[in-house]
Curated annotation (Swiss-Prot):
<dbReference type="GO" id="GO:0019556">
    <property type="term" value="P:L-histidine catabolic process to glutamate and formamide"/>
</dbReference>
<dbReference type="Pfam" id="PF17391">
    <property type="entry name" value="Urocanase_N"/>
</dbReference>
<dbReference type="InterPro" id="IPR023637">
    <property type="entry name" value="Urocanase-like"/>
</dbReference>
<keyword id="KW-0963">Cytoplasm</keyword>
<feature type="binding site">
    <location>
        <begin position="52"/>
        <end position="53"/>
    </location>
    <ligand>
        <name>NAD(+)</name>
    </ligand>
</feature>
<dbReference type="InterPro" id="IPR035400">
    <property type="entry name" value="Urocanase_N"/>
</dbReference>
<comment type="similarity">
    <text>Belongs to the urocanase family.</text>
</comment>
<feature type="binding site">
    <location>
        <position position="201"/>
    </location>
    <ligand>
        <name>NAD(+)</name>
    </ligand>
</feature>
<feature type="binding site">
    <location>
        <begin position="263"/>
        <end position="267"/>
    </location>
    <ligand>
        <name>NAD(+)</name>
    </ligand>
</feature>
<dbReference type="InterPro" id="IPR035085">
    <property type="entry name" value="Urocanase_Rossmann-like"/>
</dbReference>
<feature type="binding site">
    <location>
        <position position="130"/>
    </location>
    <ligand>
        <name>NAD(+)</name>
    </ligand>
</feature>
<dbReference type="InterPro" id="IPR036190">
    <property type="entry name" value="Urocanase_sf"/>
</dbReference>
<dbReference type="Pfam" id="PF17392">
    <property type="entry name" value="Urocanase_C"/>
</dbReference>
<dbReference type="InterPro" id="IPR055351">
    <property type="entry name" value="Urocanase"/>
</dbReference>
<keyword id="KW-0456">Lyase</keyword>
<keyword id="KW-0369">Histidine metabolism</keyword>
<dbReference type="GO" id="GO:0019557">
    <property type="term" value="P:L-histidine catabolic process to glutamate and formate"/>
</dbReference>
Length: 555
């Protein structure tokens, strides 16, 4: 019997102001853990899987129940330690210390590979936390929509003189992360054809308005794209098909998309990528009897897909890796030039990171959408001269369906994160918001990740693989008074390829919270500016100087 599987479980976080815990500082992590497993949020909540292949919120259901039990009795001078989804200890700390400290799927480097991790996973000794799954701050697909939108806007600027009308994107994957591509693409003015092997995922994206149409054949999908482009109105199409098959077929036909990328769960060849010619049922059965065979077949299909991406790039498509490590998998299967197309961070996002700009997100613990709409208005009020940001907030309100507790994401930088957070705390204090909010972010951020095939690819000074930076980020956020802090390995790109840290803080309207918020939401993005300044980026050096950061070696 698998202790991680329980189809009878249906987890819904409490709404309103009645507490199940002793304070909002412990109520918040409890609600956010539960929200990660909301049926409209998680990919497979009955298995504790939130997104990204096998990214879980807790190690098994016994651990989940015990975490909830401990949070409900935890005092405001105690800290719960969670080791790979298992609550292992409660210790006396102090009121400004984190209430929860989390470490997920961290392995000594020599053993940091999927083979060793999978053995530990089978023994119940480890849990893959992805990024925001095991750190309890996943907000559904919205969590990556704006970052994807910003990327596609940058693609249009760099390759098409800012004009996306009449152009289309080819991609793969409509899971928790990949599902953002279709909505982000149409928001940026592109049509999008997204291949997905799991029909339930396409149907879910249709239901939540992330996908406009479903197709069951390539001809049907291409006709939908062509009609939309002729009409000058972007459309997103979820095509029930294997991405490797479709990408290769387009090369064969001589059909070249304007943009090519991919967000299948290629980072996990055992659990995340369906080999060509296989059904999902066949893959599920084979995972139980021949793991090595599944991995080999999946990576062979990835090689086919990446070769097709390279061929489409040669034919004129703007081609980019969207951070799932598919190039590495193809390279290991003999595609020697797999890295000839760039990752999205060095190509389009790094200038933002240099100014500490990244995925700032917040969640209304009340469950009331009005609290989010009021904070949207506050963001516009405090940042009046950023029409691009205002446009994003307007589009988000109009087009993004809330999943679970209402939430919002918007990319803001060092100079604005603390300012916004303090304003939100004041709104809680004066009753404008009906309950506290939590503020967090993706681990994909300016100073919180080392990932040589994604966030830290092609660093100016060659420091791609140096992982001191996310460790320092986690330590500083702990010292600064975050409500919970996490340190993970393997998120996004898989075992052995990344280390990263997460942070969440509660705005409960108290003066003590204001002090913590001011420290955390300044220091957290400041570490990103520091990291990029240290690597030699002039934008980061200038930002550090303008914002008065004390960086001894930059004097």
């Amino acid at each position: 019997m698998d202790k991680r599987h329980d189809p009878s479980r249906r987890i819904i976080a409490p709404h309103g102001t009645q507490l199940s815990c002793k304070s909002w500082l412990t109520e918040a992590p409890m609600r956010m853990l539960m929200n990660n497993l909301h049926p409209d949020v998680a990919e497979r909540p009955e298995d504790l899987v939130v997104y990204g292949g096998i990214g879980r919120a807790a190690r098994d259901w016994d651990c989940y129940d015990k975490i909830i039990e401990v949070l409900q009795r935890l005092e405001d001078d105690e800290t719960l330690l969670v080791q790979s989804g298992k609550p292992v200890g409660v210790f006396r700390t102090h009121a400004d210390a984190p209430r929860v400290l989390i470490a997920n799927s961290n392995l000594v480097p020599h053993w940091a590979n999927w083979e060793h991790f999978n053995e530990l996973d089978k023994l119940g000794l480890a849990m893959y936390g992805q990024m925001t799954a095991g750190s309890w701050i996943y907000i559904g697909t919205q969590g990556i929509v704006q970052g994807t939108y910003e990327t596609f806007v940058s693609v249009a600027k760099q390759h098409f003189e800012g004009i996306s009308k009449g152009k289309w994107i080819l991609t793969g994957g409509l899971g928790g992360m990949g599902g953002a591509q279709t909505l982000a693409g149409t928001m940026a003015g592109f049509s999008v054809l997204a291949c997905e092997v799991d029909e339930t995922r396409i149907d879910f994206r249709l239901r939540t308005r992330y996908v406009d149409k479903k197709a069951t054949s390539l001809d049907e999908a291409l006709a939908m794209i062509e009609a939309a482009n002729q009409a000058g109105k972007p459309v997103s199409v979820g095509l029930l098909a294997n991405a490797a098959d479709v990408f290769a077929e387009l090369v064969k036909r001589g059909v070249t998309p304007d943009v090519v990328t991919d967000q299948t769960s290629a980072h996990d060849p055992l659990n995340g990528y369906l080999p060509q010619g296989w059904t999902m049922a066949e893959a599920a059965a084979m995972r139980k009897t021949d793991e090595a065979g599944v991995v080999k077949a999946a990576k062979a299909s990835m090689a086919v897909q990446v070769q097709a991406m390279l061929d489409l790039q040669t034919a004129g498509a703007a081609t980019l890796d969207y951070g799932n490590n598919i190039r590495q998998m193809a390279f290991e299967m003999g595609v020697e030039n797999a890295f000839d197309f760039p990752g999205f961070v060095p190509a389009y996002i790094r200038p933002l990171f240099c100014e500490g700009i990244g995925p700032f997100r917040w969640v209304a613990l009340s469950g009331d959408p009005e609290d989010i709409y009021k904070t949207d208005a506050k963001v516009k009020e405090l940042i009046p001269d950023n029409p691009h940001l205002h446009n994003w907030l307007d589009m988000a309100r109009e087009r993004i369906a809330f999943q679970g507790l209402p939430a919002r994401i918007c990319w803001v930088g060092l100079k604005d994160r603390a300012r916004l957070a303090l304003a939100f705390n004041e709104m809680v204090k004066n009753g404008e918001l009906s309950a506290p909010v939590v503020i967090g972010r993706d681990h994909l951020d300016s100073g919180s990740v080392a990932s040589p095939n994604r966030e830290t690819e092609s660093m100016l000074d060659g420091s791609d693989a140096v992982s001191d930076w996310p460790l320092l980020n986690a330590l500083l956020n702990t010292a600064s008074g975050a409500t919970w802090v996490s340190l993970h390995h393997g998120g996004g790109v898989g075992m052995g390829f990344s280390q990263h840290s997460g942070v969440v803080i509660v705005c409960d309207g108290t003066d003590a919270a204001a002090k913590r918020v001011g420290r955390v939401l300044w220091n957290d993005p400041a570490t990103g500016v520091m990291r990029h300044a240290d690597a030699g980026y002039e934008i980061a050096k200038n930002c550090a100087k303008e914002q008065g950061l004390d960086l001894p070696m930059q004097e």
